[in-house]
């Protein structure tokens, strides 16, 4: 399977996440416990990967699997990073408004490029660096409100701690992605075996988070397993399937492509979500959205198009004698 097909599918699925989540609400509220969604998504990814790993083991050429604990324990790290990241997200939102947080989140585009260079020793050309920065500028432009919609200085009115936590959140998100790519490419183990290790820890950590939530609430709603499917509808299950499928596609890209492709996919998905929201939820289209889309398309061409196509001048037409 070509990486650009996986990237395109990831863009479509990621763009539909927010839309499906909104459609799963009833009168603006969730009838289900939304903390169960990540747990079931991790369980779906683990079940899917386990099945195909079993199929590989039944074949005439068994897959390569590194089973030493010193290798397996490395797959614990992404779950720890994401757990810290989720808590930093909540802490950040106590200091800044959601729009400011979303704009600061675009820092992860640039920090991914930096960690891509420092951790994975992958060098980007000057043109590619410019493209990555343009992508961050484009996504930020699409999210900035006009002065008529909100105070123009609202972006810079949050406490200093909010900006520091926002930067930390972006760095943690980039670190989790780059570290996962490092795990996927450090050996030639089967992708499904690597997924099984990754998602086993994901299931354990999400289960632990549900148990922690029960203790924090004093078990007033009962244990989490008794309300696991309460309020679930077809749309809710579509959210679970969507979240699980995007995770599987991301792990494929981490194994056979790289983090920058994933960053472009998710950034384009965000813009696609905005465009679809204009038609589905009567959200007003803005000049900033249009400009952001144009900038991101230019960035996409700059990063992936062969250099000779970007700089090649058209051939002069031959002079014909009369």
Curated annotation (Swiss-Prot):
It comes from Oryza sativa subsp. japonica (Rice). NCBIfam families: nst. The keyword Transmembrane helix applies. The lineage of its organism: Eukaryota, Viridiplantae, Streptophyta, Embryophyta, Tracheophyta. It is a multi-pass membrane protein. Signal peptide: none annotated. The chain crosses the membrane at residues 3-23, 34-54, 76-96, 101-120, 127-144, 158-178, 199-219, 234-254, 263-283. GO terms for cellular component: Golgi membrane. PANTHER family: NUCLEOTIDE-SUGAR TRANSMEMBRANE TRANSPORTER. This is CMP-sialic acid transporter 1. Belongs to the nucleotide-sugar transporter family. CMP-Sialate:CMP antiporter (TC 2.A.7.12) subfamily.
């Amino acid at each position: 399977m070509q990486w650009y097909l996986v990237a395109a599918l990831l863009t479509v699925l990621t763009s539909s996440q927010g839309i499906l989540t909104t459609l799963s609400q009833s009168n603006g509220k969730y009838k289900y416990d939304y903390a169960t969604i990540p747990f079931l998504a991790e369980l779906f990814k683990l079940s899917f990967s386990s099945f195909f790993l079993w199929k590989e083991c039944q074949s005439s050429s068994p897959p390569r699997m590194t089973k030493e604990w010193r290798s397996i324990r490395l797959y614990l790290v992404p779950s720890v990073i994401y757990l810290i990241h989720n808590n930093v997200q909540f802490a950040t939102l106590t200091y800044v408004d959601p729009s400011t947080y979303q704009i600061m989140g675009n820092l992860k585009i640039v920090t991914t490029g930096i960690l891509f260079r420092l951790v994975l020793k992958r060098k980007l050309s000057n043109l590619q660096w410019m493209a990555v920065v343009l992508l961050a500028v484009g996504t930020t432009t699409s999210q900035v409100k006009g002065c008529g919609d909100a105070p123009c200085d609202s972006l810079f009115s949050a406490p200093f701690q909010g900006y520091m936590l926002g930067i930390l959140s972006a760095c943690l998100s980039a670190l989790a992605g780059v570290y996962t790519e490092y795990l996927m490419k450090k050996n030639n183990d089967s992708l499904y075996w690597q997924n099984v290790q990754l998602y086993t820890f994901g299931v354990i950590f999400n289960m632990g988070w549900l148990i922690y939530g029960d203790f924090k609430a004093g078990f007033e709603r009962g244990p989490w397993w008794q309300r696991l499917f309460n309020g679930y509808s077809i749309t809710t299950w579509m959210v679970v399937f969507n979240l699980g499928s995007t995770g599987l596609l991301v792990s494929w890209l981490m194994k056979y492509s790289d983090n920058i492709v994933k960053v472009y996919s998710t950034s384009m998905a965000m813009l696609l979500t905005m465009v679809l929201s204009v038609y589905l939820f009567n959200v007003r289209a803005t000049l900033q959205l249009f400009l952001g889309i144009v900038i991101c398309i230019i960035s996409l061409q700059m990063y992936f198009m062969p250099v000779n196509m970007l700089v090649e001048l058209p051939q002069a037409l031959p002079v014909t004698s009369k």
